[in-house]
Amino acid sequence: MLVTAYLAFVVLLASCLGLELSRCRAKPSGRACSNPSFLRFQLDFYQVYFLALAADWLQAPYLYKLYQHYHFLEAQIAILYVCGLASTVLFGLVASSLVDWLGRKKSCVLFSLTYSLCCLTKLSRDYFVLLVGRALGGLSTALLFSAFEAWYIHEHLERHDFPTEWIPATFARAAFWNHVLAVAAGVAAEAVACWMGLGPVAPFVAAIPLLALAGALALHNWGENYDRQRAFSRTCAGGLRCLLSDRRVLLLGTIQALFESVIFIFVFLWTPVLDPHGAPLGIIFSSFMAASLLGSSLYRIATSKRYHLQPMHLLSLAVLIVVFSLFMLTFSTSPGQESPVESFIAFLLIELACGLYFPSMSFLRRKVIPETEQAGVLNWFRVPLHLLACLGLLVLHDSDRKTGTRNMFSICSAVMVMALLAVVGLFTVVRHDAELRVPSPTGEPYTPEL
């Protein structure tokens, strides 16, 4: 398993580098890329945002392993994960309104503080302290995915008055470097935990200086901005009306809830499947992120003017790949007949599918959901998404250890078949909808929204 992991990592990394180098050679520089004021503004944003992302990714490979290291049972670990997901649901519902009221800059600094406290709780072996840490992690995750983007968009439009068309360029670059940071974070986690022999708590301690630096830079370099015009209740009510009045939005939300709930369960299960076979967890995680980056690169190539595939087609392909991978996992995790290499390949395929899924879903959401209602609609998407993931982990909590993992993959397979049916339903509704198609390339090359 050790050799397989390193070999897969090298092959995936080489594939990603090859695709990115060919893209860089072919990509012309635009006006936004050469504007000094815009580049300085981007740098101010990226310095803080990338440090926050790096700290987040650094903790991912060894979370389950840390709880195992503290001798908690799988059922107890499942409850810790459920606590984190439930916290994400609760704080995610009010995060946008809280950030708008408190201030985006203050919210980013608050993220650094709460996530640092979350990391510090990992030094304790007390179960209650770890539960509190998971709750803090849920709050931090909600702030990470709301405060930073809200701050950037407001500053971009209101303070600097840059063109709206330049916003996707910033987030497309951020999406690419997010993958790169994730790959590097996996290697760094492996280095501090295993190569340096510091144990599974080391990545969490190493994340604290990154979070402190991110908070300090935001406090020193960023201006404050607010948006106190819209109440949380009005945001949710408007989102619910949009969700119920447009079948496309309802189907898209169903696909997102089903697909991403399975991904949450996958995040919990991959470590107990591979770790008993001597897998280097940091390198495995980096391989996953490289596979996801490869999927994103393939999405960009597929939607380019040369191939001109549509995001709806790639969304369908992503769901199909995950269905196939989960069926593989139901066989590769059979008690007494485990095949860790086959399971690893299935996990890589799931991550490749995620690389296709997220830009496709992002494109379709932006086209289907009115901009003013996106926050409210996404709140309603998050509730079933996290509830499904929590239910799945609770089912695993009550299962027999030997068969529970395989049963969980079987349930996930059934959930993804339902997602596939929802994709077919959405495809039927939107097949003649020109609004949801990438426009034919004329003049300037198309840059997909990531």
Curated annotation (Swiss-Prot):
One of its GO terms (biological process) is monoatomic ion transport. Its main location: membrane. The keyword Transmembrane helix applies. SUPFAM superfamilies: MFS general substrate transporter. Mediates high-affinity intracellular uptake of the rare oligo-element molybdenum. Belongs to the major facilitator superfamily. This is Molybdate-anion transporter. It comes from Bos taurus. The lineage of its organism: Eukaryota, Metazoa, Chordata, Craniata, Vertebrata. The gene is MFSD5.
